[in-house]
Amino acid sequence: PVGKAAELSTPTQKARALGMYMADYNVLKAIGKPTDEVEGVIAKLATDLNVSFVLDILKEQAPKDATKEQLQAFLNAQEDKIIEKMAAENKIDAEVEMLGAASAEYACLVANPTLVVEGDATSAGLSTNMEKRVSMLEEVVADLAAYYPDLKQLGETIAPLKEKVASIQSARAANAEIMGIRDALLK
Protein backbone atom coordinates (compact mmCIF):
# COMPACT_ATOMS: atom_id res chain seq x y z
CA PRO A 1 0.00 0.00 0.00
CA VAL A 2 1.47 3.32 -1.09
CA GLY A 3 -0.04 5.23 1.85
CA LYS A 4 2.31 3.44 4.25
CA ALA A 5 5.37 5.14 2.78
CA ALA A 6 4.54 8.36 4.62
CA GLU A 7 4.86 6.57 7.98
CA LEU A 8 8.49 5.57 7.43
CA SER A 9 11.00 7.58 9.39
CA THR A 10 14.43 5.94 9.32
CA PRO A 11 16.71 5.62 6.27
CA THR A 12 16.75 1.85 6.85
CA GLN A 13 12.94 1.64 6.65
CA LYS A 14 12.93 3.87 3.58
CA ALA A 15 15.58 1.78 1.81
CA ARG A 16 13.64 -1.40 2.56
CA ALA A 17 10.36 0.12 1.40
CA LEU A 18 12.06 1.36 -1.77
CA GLY A 19 13.17 -2.21 -2.50
CA MET A 20 9.62 -3.48 -1.99
CA TYR A 21 8.11 -0.85 -4.26
CA MET A 22 10.76 -1.58 -6.90
CA ALA A 23 9.72 -5.24 -6.86
CA ASP A 24 6.06 -4.22 -7.19
CA TYR A 25 6.93 -1.85 -10.02
CA ASN A 26 8.73 -4.57 -11.99
CA VAL A 27 5.87 -7.01 -11.55
CA LEU A 28 3.20 -4.43 -12.45
CA LYS A 29 5.23 -3.52 -15.53
CA ALA A 30 5.64 -7.18 -16.50
CA ILE A 31 1.90 -7.87 -16.30
CA GLY A 32 0.94 -4.63 -18.03
CA LYS A 33 -0.74 -2.91 -15.07
CA PRO A 34 -0.48 0.85 -14.35
CA THR A 35 2.61 1.89 -12.36
CA ASP A 36 1.94 5.61 -11.75
CA GLU A 37 1.06 5.29 -8.07
CA VAL A 38 4.09 3.11 -7.29
CA GLU A 39 6.33 5.40 -9.37
CA GLY A 40 5.31 8.35 -7.21
CA VAL A 41 6.32 6.55 -4.02
CA ILE A 42 9.58 5.31 -5.54
CA ALA A 43 10.42 8.87 -6.60
CA LYS A 44 9.77 10.20 -3.09
CA LEU A 45 11.71 7.47 -1.27
CA ALA A 46 14.59 7.62 -3.76
CA THR A 47 14.78 11.39 -3.33
CA ASP A 48 14.74 11.07 0.47
CA LEU A 49 17.61 8.59 0.23
CA ASN A 50 19.45 10.67 -2.35
CA VAL A 51 19.33 7.89 -4.99
CA SER A 52 16.91 9.48 -7.45
CA PHE A 53 18.60 7.68 -10.37
CA VAL A 54 16.76 4.50 -9.30
CA LEU A 55 13.50 5.51 -10.99
CA ASP A 56 15.27 6.48 -14.24
CA ILE A 57 16.83 3.03 -14.42
CA LEU A 58 13.54 1.29 -13.56
CA LYS A 59 11.69 3.18 -16.27
CA GLU A 60 13.90 1.75 -19.02
CA GLN A 61 11.69 -0.38 -21.22
CA ALA A 62 12.18 -4.09 -21.70
CA PRO A 63 12.41 -5.12 -25.36
CA LYS A 64 8.96 -5.48 -26.93
CA ASP A 65 7.78 -9.10 -27.30
CA ALA A 66 10.62 -10.29 -25.07
CA THR A 67 10.63 -13.97 -24.21
CA LYS A 68 10.53 -14.98 -20.55
CA GLU A 69 14.31 -15.49 -20.63
CA GLN A 70 14.93 -12.10 -22.27
CA LEU A 71 12.69 -10.35 -19.75
CA GLN A 72 14.52 -12.05 -16.88
CA ALA A 73 17.89 -11.04 -18.37
CA PHE A 74 16.67 -7.47 -18.80
CA LEU A 75 15.45 -7.25 -15.18
CA ASN A 76 18.73 -8.74 -13.92
CA ALA A 77 20.76 -6.23 -15.94
CA GLN A 78 18.58 -3.43 -14.58
CA GLU A 79 19.15 -4.57 -11.01
CA ASP A 80 22.91 -4.80 -11.69
CA LYS A 81 22.88 -1.23 -12.99
CA ILE A 82 21.17 0.01 -9.81
CA ILE A 83 23.65 -1.95 -7.65
CA GLU A 84 26.67 -0.55 -9.52
CA LYS A 85 25.38 3.01 -9.33
CA MET A 86 24.64 2.71 -5.61
CA ALA A 87 28.06 1.21 -4.96
CA ALA A 88 29.63 4.10 -6.87
CA GLU A 89 27.67 6.53 -4.67
CA ASN A 90 28.87 4.69 -1.55
CA LYS A 91 25.38 3.53 -0.55
CA ILE A 92 26.13 -0.15 -0.06
CA ASP A 93 24.08 -0.45 3.14
CA ALA A 94 20.97 1.11 1.58
CA GLU A 95 21.45 -1.08 -1.48
CA VAL A 96 21.57 -4.31 0.53
CA GLU A 97 18.51 -3.21 2.54
CA MET A 98 16.69 -2.55 -0.76
CA LEU A 99 17.65 -5.91 -2.25
CA GLY A 100 16.71 -7.79 0.91
CA ALA A 101 13.32 -6.15 1.10
CA ALA A 102 12.78 -6.62 -2.64
CA SER A 103 13.36 -10.35 -2.12
CA ALA A 104 10.76 -10.44 0.63
CA GLU A 105 8.32 -8.59 -1.61
CA TYR A 106 8.98 -10.92 -4.56
CA ALA A 107 8.41 -13.86 -2.20
CA CYS A 108 5.04 -12.34 -1.22
CA LEU A 109 4.14 -12.01 -4.88
CA VAL A 110 5.13 -15.60 -5.65
CA ALA A 111 3.15 -16.78 -2.62
CA ASN A 112 0.00 -14.83 -3.44
CA PRO A 113 -2.21 -16.95 -5.70
CA THR A 114 -4.36 -13.99 -6.74
CA LEU A 115 -1.40 -12.01 -8.05
CA VAL A 116 0.66 -14.41 -10.04
CA VAL A 117 -0.42 -17.40 -12.05
CA GLU A 118 2.04 -20.20 -12.56
CA GLY A 119 3.85 -19.89 -15.87
CA ASP A 120 3.46 -16.12 -15.81
CA ALA A 121 6.72 -14.39 -16.77
CA THR A 122 7.17 -12.98 -13.30
CA SER A 123 6.51 -16.10 -11.26
CA ALA A 124 8.59 -18.29 -13.54
CA GLY A 125 11.60 -16.04 -13.22
CA LEU A 126 11.04 -15.32 -9.57
CA SER A 127 10.70 -18.79 -8.17
CA THR A 128 13.84 -20.10 -9.87
CA ASN A 129 15.93 -17.19 -8.63
CA MET A 130 14.52 -16.71 -5.15
CA GLU A 131 16.64 -19.26 -3.28
CA LYS A 132 19.81 -18.09 -5.03
CA ARG A 133 18.94 -14.47 -4.30
CA VAL A 134 18.38 -15.05 -0.58
CA SER A 135 21.59 -17.11 -0.28
CA MET A 136 23.61 -14.38 -1.97
CA LEU A 137 22.09 -11.75 0.29
CA GLU A 138 22.93 -13.84 3.35
CA GLU A 139 26.59 -13.89 2.30
CA VAL A 140 26.68 -10.15 1.66
CA VAL A 141 24.95 -9.42 4.96
CA ALA A 142 27.40 -11.65 6.82
CA ASP A 143 30.29 -9.69 5.31
CA LEU A 144 28.82 -6.27 6.05
CA ALA A 145 26.93 -6.74 9.32
CA ALA A 146 29.93 -5.67 11.40
CA TYR A 147 29.85 -2.27 9.69
CA TYR A 148 26.08 -1.85 9.38
CA PRO A 149 24.25 -3.30 12.41
CA ASP A 150 20.80 -2.94 10.77
CA LEU A 151 21.87 -5.44 8.13
CA LYS A 152 22.18 -8.18 10.75
CA GLN A 153 18.47 -7.85 11.49
CA LEU A 154 17.72 -7.84 7.74
CA GLY A 155 19.69 -11.05 7.25
CA GLU A 156 18.04 -12.82 10.17
CA THR A 157 14.60 -11.71 9.05
CA ILE A 158 14.86 -12.86 5.44
CA ALA A 159 16.86 -16.09 6.02
CA PRO A 160 13.71 -18.27 6.46
CA LEU A 161 12.50 -17.21 3.01
CA LYS A 162 14.92 -19.64 1.42
CA GLU A 163 13.07 -22.84 2.22
CA LYS A 164 9.66 -21.20 1.83
CA VAL A 165 10.25 -20.25 -1.81
CA ALA A 166 11.73 -23.51 -3.06
CA SER A 167 8.65 -23.87 -5.29
CA ILE A 168 5.50 -21.93 -6.02
CA GLN A 169 3.55 -24.57 -4.08
CA SER A 170 5.70 -24.21 -0.95
CA ALA A 171 5.53 -20.41 -1.21
CA ARG A 172 1.74 -20.51 -1.39
CA ALA A 173 1.59 -22.86 1.57
CA ALA A 174 3.73 -20.40 3.56
CA ASN A 175 1.91 -17.28 2.32
CA ALA A 176 1.06 -15.92 5.80
CA GLU A 177 4.58 -16.50 7.14
CA ILE A 178 6.12 -14.80 4.10
CA MET A 179 3.83 -11.79 4.58
CA GLY A 180 4.95 -11.69 8.22
CA ILE A 181 8.61 -11.63 7.17
CA ARG A 182 7.97 -8.73 4.83
CA ASP A 183 6.01 -6.79 7.46
CA ALA A 184 8.75 -7.34 10.05
CA LEU A 185 11.23 -5.55 7.78
CA LEU A 186 9.38 -2.25 8.12
CA LYS A 187 9.04 -2.32 11.91
Where are these regions (language model features)?
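Extracytoplasmic/periplasmic, Sec-exported soluble proteins
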Residues: 10-20, 30-37, 63, 88-101, ...
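Secondary-structure edge/capping motif, primarily at the C-terminal ends of alpha-helices
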Residues: 25, 29-32, 49, 56, ...
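Short, charged, amphipathic alpha-helical segments
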Residues: 39-44, 97, 124-131, 154-159, ...
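Extended amphipathic alpha-helical interaction segments
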Residues: 64-151
